[in-house]
Amino acid sequence: MVSIKGYQIKEQLYNGSRTLVYRAIQENEQKPVVIKILQNAYPSFNELLQFRNQYTIAKNLNIPGIIRPYSLESLQNSYALVMEDFGGISLHEYMQMNDNLSLQKLLSIVVQVSDILHNLHQNRVIHKDIKPANILINPETQQVKLIDFSIASLLPKESQEIKNPETLEGTLAYLSPEQTGRMNRGIDYRADFYALGITFYELLTGELPFKSNDAMELLHCHIAK
């Protein structure tokens, strides 16, 4: 298990293809925290840039509906992102544990995320990767928070959108048509609500609206269907 100075690692919460997440105690204040690190021992410049980006954007947002970042620690050739631990699990995991949620509870979740997105957009931030894995819910309080601002964008004051993207960013199954880079249109706050719509569809039906193992076919579905 990873060792980080000043923190006592308690358990591993997540082991993904790109990141590892741990629950820990900050030793000085005896405060519970969550720590996210990169899987790659020698991350690329772009991976490091995205890691710094999620800290830089989130730390300047005074919004209760996002996971608060505490610090970005140096860790060998990489970083460790230290965040608040509010006792949440991913919405993806929560739905697997509760496959018969009432419509009222589902609507409560979606309304909370909608309010968080509204606050984000009031702060000129577009998340660009809304999906069940990036929405945390506390099983006891039902409070919802957003995580992972690694590809989020802060809009300049003079603009309401990001120019037509040259590279594809986001998760294919939840990607807005504008994020495909094939629409000759900029990206604005509606991209996040498009992804939230797909997320709500998945919560209601238990499946995604577009199902394909072919990336190009999925892109076409988002654009044309």
Residue ranges and their predicted role:
Residues Y42-N60:
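AlphaC helix of the eukaryotic protein kinase fold
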Residues S71-L72:
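A short, aromatic-enriched beta-strand patch in the conserved N-lobe beta-sheet
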Residues Q76-S90, Y94:
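Conserved short submotifs of the Hanks-type protein kinase catalytic core
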Residues I109-V110:
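Activation segment signature within eukaryotic-like protein kinase domains
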Residues D115-V125:
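Protein kinase catalytic-loop region centered on the HRD/HxD motif
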Residues T205-L208:
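Structural helix C-cap motif within protein kinase domains
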